[in-house]
């Protein structure tokens, strides 16, 4: 079977044998054609079967070629036999099972083109079409080369189409249905997509006739050029061909296919599925801008560039695989433009050259006067291994320094660091007008510092920022990328900074450590745990600032004073000093004239510690050493072991306190304060029972004094200094 036809199948009526049909076909080939086909008797269910005529049903438009032509040739159609269906005939019709034929229609209306199942069960007779019965006009001679096509010439006995074949002189395939559509052009998209549902096939409303209502324009002057099946690029099985031709179920011998004369865009459509439609290729027009005076006037720079490129010697280029047909303006766009970044490269080169010049000068010079200011220095590495650079702006007297040398010194410090990732801690504490550099100098620094300064900067911490520094950064907002603002962190409290970097590593000056922003309330020192006081941001050393200042004051002015720590100072002055320290003020003890007031302030601090300098859990151990019968060296070793068990904060304060008391003992000949007298004064403040029982405290007072005296007598051994 030829592959150009759609596959269709049907069931033979009961009692019909395919061998009988083949035998009848052979007899018809050997006999002369009859004027009309003989009626075939209806097979009986209880008798021997007789051959039933082969039904050839044509689905599609039934418009006659004679009706289309302007001057139809008169023909004498043969009378079509009519049959009256009976109950058996109805049953036979119901036995036909035609496969739904795919019709080239959108999916939404495809169901309307299917064969209604109840059509074959209609008891009305099949309406004749004017000549013969259904399929009688589709007579096709059997090709000489096809000897195995069984049943293709069953209708050769019907001679009622001979006149029609003679009248159509331009037809060479003797296929009337194909000729009916030979002058029909391909349907357009609008005619197919806008077809109303009421114009679809409906056999019941058309009295049993099957029609295809596709709007087509008949071209009378096309002749036979557009006839035959389409053989375009879609192939012989294209569904587009079935839209313009009748759909046949039954036997039919097709003629050789011919190409359809359709437009290029229509031939690319393989189906009505819009998702697979190939769009027409875009059309480009060549425009020569040189022929447009107004364009040349408006684009003089582009024309000059093109002329210069034409004058320059062309370098041999590799042959391109595909030559572009675009010319004129589009050629100028597609051609490789000159490097527009040349100016930027020169600008970057000038900046780098200037930076390299400063770097060379910085390596060949020394800056002792700037180095003594200590306004910029590396401070080790953070926990991620990044170098920390600390800048203290208040240490740089701008008005008194040569800022060019300051820039050279800054480059000498920063250049080895910025090769890798680094972190910058900028301390803006205590800034005033004498420390603020000019905007021109800051802009110059920003311009000279090359990309590695900005790229490798992973964190910028601004300590104690003011409105001026925030305003200055706002000015440079348009020159800074969004990544810079993600690296920026404002630090108002040093405690937040010390959570990121160790206090000892940053080594900030005391003036910075003691700074407290305005409006921030300080926590009290007296009565607070020793460890908390030491870890506060405003406490720069390893001991409370109160003790640090007090010991320094007494070392200068109190070692020669008789009765130091034994005599009490003015209670009002002690209270005033305590309030100043608790409020976070920078108390200057040099203004205090009475030495005993400062000594009393230190004893008050030790007395109000929530946990004594020698903790409660070691109280019994100290008492046992004093009560024991060990030798003095053994007791010293035991004390050394207990002192090593002290917390770090307690150990640091004990070391500073007893070191100072050792100096007092050294001057005991003047101040009358030996180890015995000092033990009586400090023992109750250094070692106490947690229970706080007065009777036990009185009973253990002697042993407490003895253990403190033993420590004072062996300060050098116990504290290793």
From Swiss-Prot:
GO terms for molecular function: GTPase activator activity. Residues 34-44 have a biased composition (Pro residues). It comes from Dictyostelium discoideum (Social amoeba). It is found in: Cytoplasm. InterPro entries: CRAL-TRIO_dom, CRAL-TRIO_dom_sf, Rho_GTPase_activation_prot, RhoGAP_dom. Keywords: Cytoplasm, GTPase activation. Residues 169-181 have a biased composition (Acidic residues). The lineage of its organism: Eukaryota, Amoebozoa, Evosea, Eumycetozoa, Dictyostelia. The record marks 566 as: Arginine finger. Residues 363-520 form the CRAL-TRIO domain. This is Rho GTPase-activating protein gacY. CDD domains: RhoGAP, SEC14. Pfam families: CRAL_TRIO_2 (PF13716), RhoGAP (PF00620). Its main location: cytoplasm. GO terms for cellular component: cytoplasm. Residues 1-325 are annotated as: Disordered. The keyword Magnesium does not apply.
């Amino acid at each position: 079977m030829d592959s150009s036809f759609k596959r269709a199948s049907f069931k033979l009526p009961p009692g019909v044998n395919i061998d009988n049909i083949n035998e009848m076909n052979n007899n018809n080939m050997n006999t002369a054609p009859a004027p009309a086909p003989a009626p075939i008797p209806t097979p009986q269910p209880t008798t021997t079967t007789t051959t039933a005529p082969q039904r050839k049903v044509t689905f599609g438009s039934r418009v006659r070629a004679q009706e289309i032509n302007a001057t139809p040739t008169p023909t004498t159609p043969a009378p079509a036999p009519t049959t009256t269906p009976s109950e058996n005939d109805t049953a036979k019709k119901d036995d036909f099972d035609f496969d739904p034929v795919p019709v080239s229609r959108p999916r939404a209306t495809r169901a309307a083109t299917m064969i209604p199942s109840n059509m074959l069960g209609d008891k009305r007779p099949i309406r004749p079409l004017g000549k013969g019965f259904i399929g009688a006009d589709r007579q096709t001679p059997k090709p000489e080369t096809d000897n195995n096509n069984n049943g293709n010439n069953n209708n050769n006995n019907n001679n009622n189409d001979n006149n029609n074949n003679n009248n159509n002189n331009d037809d060479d395939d003797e296929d009337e249905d194909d000729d009916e559509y030979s002058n029909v052009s391909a349907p357009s998209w609008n005619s197919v997509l806008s077809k109303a549902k009421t114009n679809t096939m409906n056999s019941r409303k058309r009295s049993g006739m099957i029609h295809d209502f596709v709007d087509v324009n008949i071209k009378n002057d096309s002749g036979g050029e557009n006839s035959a099946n389409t053989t375009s690029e879609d192939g012989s099985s294209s569904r587009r061909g079935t839209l313009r031709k009748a759909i046949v179920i039954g036997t039919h011998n097709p003629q050789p296919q011919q190409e359809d004369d359709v437009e290029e865009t229509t031939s690319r459509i393989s189906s009505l599925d819009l998702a697979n439609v190939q769009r027409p290729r875009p059309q480009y027009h060549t425009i020569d801008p040189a022929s447009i005076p107004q364009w040349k006037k408006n684009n003089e720079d582009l024309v000059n560039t093109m002329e210069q490129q034409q004058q320059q010697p062309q370098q041999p280029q590799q042959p391109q695989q595909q030559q572009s047909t675009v010319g004129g303006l589009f050629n100028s766009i597609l051609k490789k433009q000159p490097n527009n970044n040349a100016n930027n490269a020169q600008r970057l080169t000038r900046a780098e050259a200037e930076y390299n010049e400063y770097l060379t000068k910085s390596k060949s010079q020394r800056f002792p006067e700037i180095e003594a200011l200590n306004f910029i220095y590396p401070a080790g590495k953070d926990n991620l291994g990044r170098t920390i650079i600390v800048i203290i702006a208040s240490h740089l007297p701008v008005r008194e320094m040569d800022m060019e040398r300051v820039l050279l010194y800054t480059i000498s410090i920063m250049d080895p660091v910025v090769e890798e990732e680094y972190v910058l801690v900028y301390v803006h504490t205590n800034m005033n007008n004498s420390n603020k550099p000019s905007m021109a100098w800051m802009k110059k620094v920003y311009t000279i510092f090359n990309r590695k300064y900005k790229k490798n900067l992973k964190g910028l911490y601004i300590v104690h920022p003011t409105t001026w520094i925030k305003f200055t950064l706002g000015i440079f907002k348009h020159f800074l990328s969004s990544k810079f603002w993600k690296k920026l962190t404002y630090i108002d409290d040093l405690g937040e900074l010390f959570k990121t970097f160790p206090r000892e590593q940053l080594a900030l000056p005391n003036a910075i450590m003691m700074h407290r922003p305005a409006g921030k309330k300080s926590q009290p020192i007296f009565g607070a745990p020793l460890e908390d006081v030491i870890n506060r941001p405003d406490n720069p050393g390893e001991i409370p600032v109160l003790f640090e200042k007090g010991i320094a004051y007494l070392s200068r002015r109190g070692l020669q004073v008789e009765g130091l720590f034994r005599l009490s100072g003015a209670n009002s002055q002690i209270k005033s000093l305590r309030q100043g320290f608790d409020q976070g003020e920078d108390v200057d003890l040099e203004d205090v004239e009475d030495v005993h007031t400062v000594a009393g302030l230190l004893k008050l601090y030790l007395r109000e510690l929530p946990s004594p300098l020698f903790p409660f859990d070691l109280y019994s151990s100290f008492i046992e050493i004093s009560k024991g019968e060990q030798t003095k060296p053994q007791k010293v070793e035991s004390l050394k072991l207990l002192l090593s068990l002290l917390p770090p904060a307690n150990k640091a304060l004990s070391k500073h306190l007893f070191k100072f008391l050792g100096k007092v003992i050294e001057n005991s000949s003047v101040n009358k304060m030996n180890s015995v007298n000092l033990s009586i004064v400090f023992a109750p403040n250094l070692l106490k029972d947690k229970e706080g029982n007065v009777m036990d405290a009185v009973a253990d007072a002697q042993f407490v004094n003895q253990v403190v005296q033993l420590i004072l007598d062996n300060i050098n051994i116990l504290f290793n200094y």
